[in-house]
Swiss-Prot record:
One of its GO terms (molecular function) is phosphoglycerate kinase activity. ADP binds at residues 217, 223, 241, 314, 338, 344-345, 377-378. This is Phosphoglycerate kinase, cytosolic. Its EC number is 2.7.2.3.
Length: 420
Protein backbone atom coordinates (compact mmCIF):
# COMPACT_ATOMS: atom_id res chain seq x y z
CA UNK A 1 0.00 0.00 0.00
CA UNK A 2 1.25 3.46 -0.83
CA UNK A 3 -0.10 6.72 0.45
CA UNK A 4 -0.53 9.18 -2.39
CA UNK A 5 0.41 12.78 -1.82
CA UNK A 6 -2.56 15.05 -1.26
CA UNK A 7 -3.31 18.61 -2.32
CA UNK A 8 -1.69 20.93 0.20
CA UNK A 9 -3.02 24.05 1.86
CA UNK A 10 -0.10 25.74 0.04
CA UNK A 11 -1.93 25.14 -3.25
CA UNK A 12 -5.17 26.81 -2.09
CA UNK A 13 -6.16 30.40 -2.85
CA UNK A 14 -7.06 31.51 0.68
CA UNK A 15 -7.24 35.30 0.24
CA UNK A 16 -10.62 36.74 1.22
CA UNK A 17 -12.03 33.22 1.65
CA UNK A 18 -13.56 31.52 4.64
CA UNK A 19 -11.62 28.31 5.25
CA UNK A 20 -13.21 25.46 7.19
CA UNK A 21 -10.46 23.60 9.03
CA UNK A 22 -11.15 20.26 10.71
CA UNK A 23 -8.65 20.15 13.58
CA UNK A 24 -8.09 17.65 16.39
CA UNK A 25 -8.55 19.60 19.62
CA UNK A 26 -9.44 16.47 21.61
CA UNK A 27 -7.28 17.59 24.53
CA UNK A 28 -7.36 16.47 28.17
CA UNK A 29 -9.44 18.86 30.31
CA UNK A 30 -9.80 18.68 34.10
CA UNK A 31 -12.20 21.03 35.85
CA UNK A 32 -12.31 23.32 32.83
CA UNK A 33 -8.50 23.51 32.63
CA UNK A 34 -6.52 22.06 29.70
CA UNK A 35 -3.75 19.83 31.07
CA UNK A 36 -1.89 19.33 27.76
CA UNK A 37 -2.23 21.73 24.81
CA UNK A 38 0.06 19.83 22.38
CA UNK A 39 -2.75 19.21 19.88
CA UNK A 40 -3.76 22.87 19.88
CA UNK A 41 -0.16 23.98 19.29
CA UNK A 42 0.18 21.37 16.51
CA UNK A 43 -2.59 23.08 14.52
CA UNK A 44 -1.11 26.60 14.75
CA UNK A 45 0.94 26.53 11.49
CA UNK A 46 -2.17 25.72 9.42
CA UNK A 47 -4.27 28.38 11.17
CA UNK A 48 -1.49 30.98 10.78
CA UNK A 49 -1.19 30.16 7.06
CA UNK A 50 -4.89 30.95 6.49
CA UNK A 51 -4.62 34.23 8.40
CA UNK A 52 -1.32 35.29 6.80
CA UNK A 53 -2.82 34.76 3.33
CA UNK A 54 -5.69 37.15 4.13
CA UNK A 55 -8.35 34.56 4.84
CA UNK A 56 -10.54 33.79 7.84
CA UNK A 57 -10.65 30.51 9.72
CA UNK A 58 -13.62 28.44 10.94
CA UNK A 59 -12.36 25.62 13.16
CA UNK A 60 -14.22 22.38 13.88
CA UNK A 61 -13.30 19.65 16.35
CA UNK A 62 -14.64 17.04 18.73
CA UNK A 63 -13.68 16.58 22.36
CA UNK A 64 -14.34 13.37 24.27
CA UNK A 65 -17.33 11.14 23.64
CA UNK A 66 -20.48 13.11 24.53
CA UNK A 67 -23.84 11.35 24.08
CA UNK A 68 -25.08 13.93 21.59
CA UNK A 69 -28.59 14.51 20.23
CA UNK A 70 -30.01 14.29 16.71
CA UNK A 71 -30.57 17.35 14.51
CA UNK A 72 -34.34 16.73 14.63
CA UNK A 73 -34.31 17.29 18.41
CA UNK A 74 -32.23 20.47 18.27
CA UNK A 75 -34.96 23.05 17.54
CA UNK A 76 -36.90 22.21 20.71
CA UNK A 77 -33.73 22.43 22.82
CA UNK A 78 -32.78 25.79 21.27
CA UNK A 79 -36.28 27.22 21.86
CA UNK A 80 -35.83 26.34 25.55
CA UNK A 81 -32.71 28.53 25.52
CA UNK A 82 -30.25 25.63 25.76
CA UNK A 83 -27.38 24.37 23.59
CA UNK A 84 -28.27 21.10 21.82
CA UNK A 85 -26.28 18.13 23.12
CA UNK A 86 -24.29 20.26 25.55
CA UNK A 87 -22.15 18.52 28.17
CA UNK A 88 -19.89 20.70 30.31
CA UNK A 89 -17.11 18.09 30.40
CA UNK A 90 -16.93 18.11 26.58
CA UNK A 91 -17.27 21.80 25.71
CA UNK A 92 -14.56 23.39 23.55
CA UNK A 93 -14.92 26.76 25.29
CA UNK A 94 -11.64 26.37 27.27
CA UNK A 95 -9.92 25.49 23.99
CA UNK A 96 -11.11 28.75 22.39
CA UNK A 97 -9.58 30.66 25.28
CA UNK A 98 -6.26 28.79 25.10
CA UNK A 99 -6.10 29.14 21.31
CA UNK A 100 -6.65 32.89 21.66
CA UNK A 101 -3.68 33.06 24.04
CA UNK A 102 -1.47 31.12 21.63
CA UNK A 103 -2.51 33.26 18.63
CA UNK A 104 -2.41 36.50 20.65
CA UNK A 105 -5.81 37.45 19.24
CA UNK A 106 -9.44 36.86 20.20
CA UNK A 107 -11.03 33.62 19.04
CA UNK A 108 -14.81 33.84 18.68
CA UNK A 109 -16.57 30.82 20.17
CA UNK A 110 -19.79 29.67 18.46
CA UNK A 111 -21.77 27.78 21.16
CA UNK A 112 -23.80 25.67 18.69
CA UNK A 113 -21.90 24.28 15.69
CA UNK A 114 -25.07 23.93 13.57
CA UNK A 115 -26.49 27.35 14.45
CA UNK A 116 -23.48 29.53 13.70
CA UNK A 117 -24.51 31.18 10.41
CA UNK A 118 -24.88 34.63 12.02
CA UNK A 119 -21.46 34.38 13.69
CA UNK A 120 -19.83 33.33 10.42
CA UNK A 121 -21.53 36.14 8.42
CA UNK A 122 -19.84 38.76 10.61
CA UNK A 123 -16.34 37.37 9.96
CA UNK A 124 -13.68 39.50 8.29
CA UNK A 125 -10.28 38.42 6.94
CA UNK A 126 -8.02 37.57 9.88
CA UNK A 127 -10.87 36.38 12.11
CA UNK A 128 -10.93 32.98 13.82
CA UNK A 129 -14.10 31.20 14.93
CA UNK A 130 -14.13 27.92 16.86
CA UNK A 131 -17.37 25.97 16.61
CA UNK A 132 -18.64 24.02 19.63
CA UNK A 133 -17.98 20.26 19.82
CA UNK A 134 -19.24 18.61 16.61
CA UNK A 135 -20.04 15.43 18.56
CA UNK A 136 -22.84 17.25 20.40
CA UNK A 137 -24.77 16.07 17.32
CA UNK A 138 -25.08 12.32 16.73
CA UNK A 139 -24.98 12.81 12.97
CA UNK A 140 -21.24 13.56 13.17
CA UNK A 141 -20.47 9.87 13.72
CA UNK A 142 -23.65 8.32 12.32
CA UNK A 143 -23.35 5.00 10.48
CA UNK A 144 -25.85 6.35 7.91
CA UNK A 145 -24.28 8.43 5.15
CA UNK A 146 -27.43 10.52 4.59
CA UNK A 147 -27.40 11.60 8.25
CA UNK A 148 -23.73 12.56 8.09
CA UNK A 149 -24.42 14.46 4.86
CA UNK A 150 -27.30 16.41 6.44
CA UNK A 151 -24.93 17.74 9.10
CA UNK A 152 -22.10 18.27 6.60
CA UNK A 153 -24.35 20.44 4.38
CA UNK A 154 -24.96 22.90 7.23
CA UNK A 155 -21.26 23.12 8.13
CA UNK A 156 -20.17 23.35 4.47
CA UNK A 157 -22.49 26.35 4.00
CA UNK A 158 -20.27 28.38 6.36
CA UNK A 159 -17.13 28.32 4.21
CA UNK A 160 -15.51 28.30 0.77
CA UNK A 161 -12.57 25.91 1.26
CA UNK A 162 -12.12 22.73 3.32
CA UNK A 163 -8.78 21.84 4.91
CA UNK A 164 -8.26 18.71 7.00
CA UNK A 165 -5.64 18.80 9.74
CA UNK A 166 -7.10 16.08 12.00
CA UNK A 167 -5.03 12.97 11.37
CA UNK A 168 -6.16 11.61 14.75
CA UNK A 169 -9.68 11.03 13.37
CA UNK A 170 -8.71 10.22 9.76
CA UNK A 171 -9.79 6.59 10.27
CA UNK A 172 -13.39 7.68 10.90
CA UNK A 173 -16.10 8.28 8.29
CA UNK A 174 -17.75 11.33 9.86
CA UNK A 175 -19.69 14.43 8.84
CA UNK A 176 -16.66 16.69 9.38
CA UNK A 177 -13.92 14.37 8.05
CA UNK A 178 -15.53 12.98 4.89
CA UNK A 179 -18.98 14.63 4.66
CA UNK A 180 -17.88 18.25 4.15
CA UNK A 181 -15.34 17.52 1.38
CA UNK A 182 -18.02 15.40 -0.36
CA UNK A 183 -20.52 18.29 -0.20
CA UNK A 184 -18.00 20.95 -1.30
CA UNK A 185 -16.40 18.69 -3.90
CA UNK A 186 -12.87 19.36 -2.72
CA UNK A 187 -10.51 19.05 0.25
CA UNK A 188 -6.86 19.82 1.00
CA UNK A 189 -4.42 18.72 3.69
CA UNK A 190 -3.18 21.08 6.38
CA UNK A 191 0.45 21.05 7.49
CA UNK A 192 -0.01 18.50 10.29
CA UNK A 193 -1.95 16.10 8.04
CA UNK A 194 0.69 16.57 5.33
CA UNK A 195 3.50 15.70 7.75
CA UNK A 196 1.71 12.55 8.94
CA UNK A 197 1.04 11.38 5.36
CA UNK A 198 4.63 12.13 4.35
CA UNK A 199 6.25 10.06 7.14
CA UNK A 200 3.88 7.11 6.93
CA UNK A 201 4.19 6.98 3.14
CA UNK A 202 7.99 6.81 3.55
CA UNK A 203 7.94 3.99 6.10
CA UNK A 204 5.27 2.01 4.20
CA UNK A 205 6.70 2.72 0.77
CA UNK A 206 10.46 2.83 0.27
CA UNK A 207 12.13 3.46 3.64
CA UNK A 208 15.88 3.72 4.24
CA UNK A 209 17.03 0.21 5.24
CA UNK A 210 17.39 -1.70 7.47
CA UNK A 211 13.90 -1.00 8.88
CA UNK A 212 12.99 -2.13 12.40
CA UNK A 213 9.49 -2.33 13.86
CA UNK A 214 9.29 -2.18 17.66
CA UNK A 215 5.91 -3.56 18.69
CA UNK A 216 4.56 -3.73 22.23
CA UNK A 217 1.28 -3.52 24.07
CA UNK A 218 -0.78 -6.14 25.82
CA UNK A 219 -2.43 -8.31 23.19
CA UNK A 220 -1.21 -10.15 20.10
CA UNK A 221 -4.84 -10.12 18.93
CA UNK A 222 -4.80 -6.28 18.81
CA UNK A 223 -1.70 -6.30 16.60
CA UNK A 224 -2.34 -9.29 14.27
CA UNK A 225 -3.00 -7.19 11.18
CA UNK A 226 -0.17 -4.79 11.97
CA UNK A 227 2.33 -7.65 12.39
CA UNK A 228 1.08 -9.45 9.29
CA UNK A 229 1.34 -6.30 7.16
CA UNK A 230 4.67 -5.09 8.58
CA UNK A 231 6.35 -8.52 8.18
CA UNK A 232 6.20 -7.85 4.42
CA UNK A 233 8.19 -4.63 4.84
CA UNK A 234 10.63 -4.85 7.75
CA UNK A 235 14.09 -6.31 8.37
CA UNK A 236 13.88 -6.60 12.17
CA UNK A 237 11.00 -7.04 14.61
CA UNK A 238 11.45 -6.32 18.32
CA UNK A 239 8.58 -7.54 20.50
CA UNK A 240 7.90 -6.25 24.02
CA UNK A 241 5.00 -5.61 26.36
CA UNK A 242 2.61 -8.31 27.56
CA UNK A 243 2.13 -9.64 24.02
CA UNK A 244 5.71 -11.00 24.20
CA UNK A 245 4.66 -13.62 26.77
CA UNK A 246 2.21 -15.23 24.33
CA UNK A 247 5.10 -15.60 21.85
CA UNK A 248 7.44 -16.96 24.56
CA UNK A 249 4.88 -19.51 25.73
CA UNK A 250 4.36 -20.53 22.09
CA UNK A 251 8.10 -21.27 21.98
CA UNK A 252 7.86 -23.44 25.11
CA UNK A 253 9.12 -20.97 27.74
CA UNK A 254 7.72 -20.77 31.27
CA UNK A 255 5.88 -17.48 31.78
CA UNK A 256 4.68 -17.72 35.41
CA UNK A 257 1.50 -15.71 35.95
CA UNK A 258 2.30 -13.24 33.13
CA UNK A 259 -0.51 -12.17 30.86
CA UNK A 260 -0.99 -14.63 27.99
CA UNK A 261 -3.58 -15.20 25.29
CA UNK A 262 -3.84 -18.99 25.47
CA UNK A 263 -6.11 -19.07 22.41
CA UNK A 264 -3.49 -17.24 20.30
CA UNK A 265 -0.50 -19.56 20.73
CA UNK A 266 -0.93 -21.09 17.25
CA UNK A 267 -1.26 -17.60 15.79
CA UNK A 268 2.00 -16.55 17.49
CA UNK A 269 3.75 -19.62 16.04
CA UNK A 270 2.41 -18.87 12.55
CA UNK A 271 3.60 -15.25 12.75
CA UNK A 272 7.09 -16.41 13.81
CA UNK A 273 7.11 -18.88 10.89
CA UNK A 274 6.02 -16.11 8.50
CA UNK A 275 8.88 -13.93 9.78
CA UNK A 276 11.35 -16.77 9.21
CA UNK A 277 10.05 -17.35 5.67
CA UNK A 278 10.42 -13.64 4.90
CA UNK A 279 13.90 -13.50 6.48
CA UNK A 280 12.78 -11.02 9.14
CA UNK A 281 14.90 -11.28 12.29
CA UNK A 282 12.60 -11.42 15.34
CA UNK A 283 13.94 -10.52 18.79
CA UNK A 284 11.98 -11.53 21.89
CA UNK A 285 12.84 -10.78 25.53
CA UNK A 286 15.71 -12.89 26.93
CA UNK A 287 15.17 -11.64 30.49
CA UNK A 288 12.44 -9.85 32.44
CA UNK A 289 11.63 -7.56 35.35
CA UNK A 290 9.01 -9.37 37.46
CA UNK A 291 6.98 -9.28 40.65
CA UNK A 292 4.39 -11.50 42.32
CA UNK A 293 1.77 -8.74 42.07
CA UNK A 294 0.79 -6.03 39.60
CA UNK A 295 2.23 -3.17 41.65
CA UNK A 296 5.29 -0.97 41.92
CA UNK A 297 7.99 -2.26 44.30
CA UNK A 298 11.50 -1.04 45.11
CA UNK A 299 13.21 -4.35 44.31
CA UNK A 300 11.49 -6.26 41.50
CA UNK A 301 12.97 -9.63 40.47
CA UNK A 302 15.19 -9.68 37.36
CA UNK A 303 15.25 -13.12 35.72
CA UNK A 304 18.47 -14.77 34.53
CA UNK A 305 16.94 -15.86 31.22
CA UNK A 306 13.71 -15.93 29.19
CA UNK A 307 11.88 -18.20 31.68
CA UNK A 308 9.70 -16.51 34.30
CA UNK A 309 9.48 -18.15 37.76
CA UNK A 310 6.18 -19.63 38.99
CA UNK A 311 4.03 -17.12 40.83
CA UNK A 312 5.73 -14.15 39.11
CA UNK A 313 4.47 -11.89 36.34
CA UNK A 314 6.79 -10.03 33.97
CA UNK A 315 6.11 -6.27 33.89
CA UNK A 316 9.05 -5.00 31.80
CA UNK A 317 11.88 -6.26 29.61
CA UNK A 318 15.16 -6.95 31.44
CA UNK A 319 18.65 -5.40 31.06
CA UNK A 320 19.98 -8.01 28.57
CA UNK A 321 16.91 -7.53 26.39
CA UNK A 322 17.33 -3.75 26.57
CA UNK A 323 20.96 -4.12 25.39
CA UNK A 324 19.87 -6.37 22.48
CA UNK A 325 17.09 -3.99 21.41
CA UNK A 326 19.27 -0.87 21.68
CA UNK A 327 22.00 -2.58 19.62
CA UNK A 328 19.49 -3.57 16.91
CA UNK A 329 18.02 -0.05 16.70
CA UNK A 330 21.61 1.20 16.27
CA UNK A 331 22.03 -0.95 13.13
CA UNK A 332 18.95 0.49 11.42
CA UNK A 333 18.22 3.46 9.18
CA UNK A 334 14.44 3.53 9.84
CA UNK A 335 12.34 2.64 12.89
CA UNK A 336 8.62 2.52 13.58
CA UNK A 337 7.47 2.08 17.17
CA UNK A 338 3.98 1.02 18.25
CA UNK A 339 3.33 -0.02 21.85
CA UNK A 340 5.32 0.14 25.12
CA UNK A 341 7.80 -2.51 26.34
CA UNK A 342 6.31 -2.74 29.83
CA UNK A 343 4.06 -1.06 32.39
CA UNK A 344 5.90 2.25 31.92
CA UNK A 345 3.35 4.16 34.03
CA UNK A 346 4.97 2.51 37.10
CA UNK A 347 8.57 3.72 37.62
CA UNK A 348 10.17 0.28 38.35
CA UNK A 349 8.83 -1.01 35.02
CA UNK A 350 9.58 1.99 32.79
CA UNK A 351 13.24 1.29 32.00
CA UNK A 352 12.63 -0.86 28.91
CA UNK A 353 10.23 1.59 27.28
CA UNK A 354 12.36 4.64 28.10
CA UNK A 355 15.55 2.88 26.92
CA UNK A 356 13.93 2.19 23.53
CA UNK A 357 12.82 5.84 23.35
CA UNK A 358 16.35 7.04 24.20
CA UNK A 359 17.95 4.70 21.65
CA UNK A 360 15.61 6.00 18.95
CA UNK A 361 16.26 9.61 19.97
CA UNK A 362 20.06 9.10 20.05
CA UNK A 363 20.16 7.32 16.67
CA UNK A 364 17.92 9.97 15.10
CA UNK A 365 20.18 12.79 16.27
CA UNK A 366 23.56 11.08 15.70
CA UNK A 367 23.02 8.62 12.83
CA UNK A 368 20.12 10.18 10.91
CA UNK A 369 17.68 7.38 11.81
CA UNK A 370 14.18 8.04 10.45
CA UNK A 371 12.17 7.44 13.64
CA UNK A 372 8.38 7.33 13.69
CA UNK A 373 6.27 6.88 16.80
CA UNK A 374 2.75 5.56 16.17
CA UNK A 375 0.46 7.60 18.46
CA UNK A 376 -1.35 6.45 21.60
CA UNK A 377 0.70 4.88 24.41
CA UNK A 378 3.97 5.07 22.44
CA UNK A 379 3.53 8.82 21.96
CA UNK A 380 2.79 9.22 25.70
CA UNK A 381 5.90 7.16 26.52
CA UNK A 382 8.05 9.25 24.17
CA UNK A 383 6.72 12.43 25.82
CA UNK A 384 7.27 11.12 29.37
CA UNK A 385 10.81 9.94 28.58
CA UNK A 386 11.70 13.43 27.33
CA UNK A 387 12.72 11.99 23.94
CA UNK A 388 9.72 13.08 21.83
CA UNK A 389 11.41 16.20 20.40
CA UNK A 390 14.46 14.13 19.30
CA UNK A 391 12.38 11.83 17.06
CA UNK A 392 11.73 12.43 13.36
CA UNK A 393 7.98 12.21 13.89
CA UNK A 394 5.59 11.52 16.76
CA UNK A 395 2.16 10.76 15.31
CA UNK A 396 -0.90 12.53 16.69
CA UNK A 397 -3.16 9.59 15.80
CA UNK A 398 -3.20 6.34 17.77
CA UNK A 399 -6.07 4.57 16.00
CA UNK A 400 -5.31 6.20 12.63
CA UNK A 401 -1.61 5.26 12.67
CA UNK A 402 -2.45 1.69 13.74
CA UNK A 403 -4.88 1.29 10.82
CA UNK A 404 -2.30 2.65 8.37
CA UNK A 405 0.31 0.18 9.66
CA UNK A 406 -2.29 -2.56 9.23
CA UNK A 407 -2.45 -1.64 5.53
CA UNK A 408 -5.90 -0.07 5.68
CA UNK A 409 -7.10 3.02 3.81
CA UNK A 410 -8.06 6.00 5.97
CA UNK A 411 -11.37 7.54 4.78
CA UNK A 412 -10.38 11.02 6.01
CA UNK A 413 -7.20 10.92 3.90
CA UNK A 414 -8.64 9.16 0.83
CA UNK A 415 -11.36 11.83 0.40
CA UNK A 416 -8.84 14.68 -0.02
CA UNK A 417 -7.81 15.86 -3.49
CA UNK A 418 -4.70 14.26 -4.98
CA UNK A 419 -1.66 16.48 -5.48
CA UNK A 420 -1.60 17.62 -9.10
Amino acid sequence: MTLNEKKSINECDLKGKKTLVRVDFNVPVKGGVITNDYRIRSALPTIQKVLNEGGSCILMSHLGRPKGISISEAAAVRSAGKVPGYEEAATLRPVAQRLGELLSKPVVFAPDCLDAADVVKKMSPGDVVLLENVRFYREEGSKKEEEREAMAKVLASYGDIFVSDAFGTAHRDSATMTGIPKVLGHGAAGYLMEKEISYFSKVLGNPPRPLVAIVGGSKVSDKIQLLDNMLQRIDYLLIGGAMAYTFLKAQGHRIGTSMCEEDRLDLARSLLKKAEDRKVQVLLPVDHVCHTEFKAVDTPVVTADADIPDGHMALDIGPKTIANYVETIGKCKSAIWNGPMGVFEMTPYSKGTFAVAKAMGDCTQKNGLMSIIGGGDSASAAEQSGEATRMSHVSTGGGASLELLEGKTLPGVAILDEKV
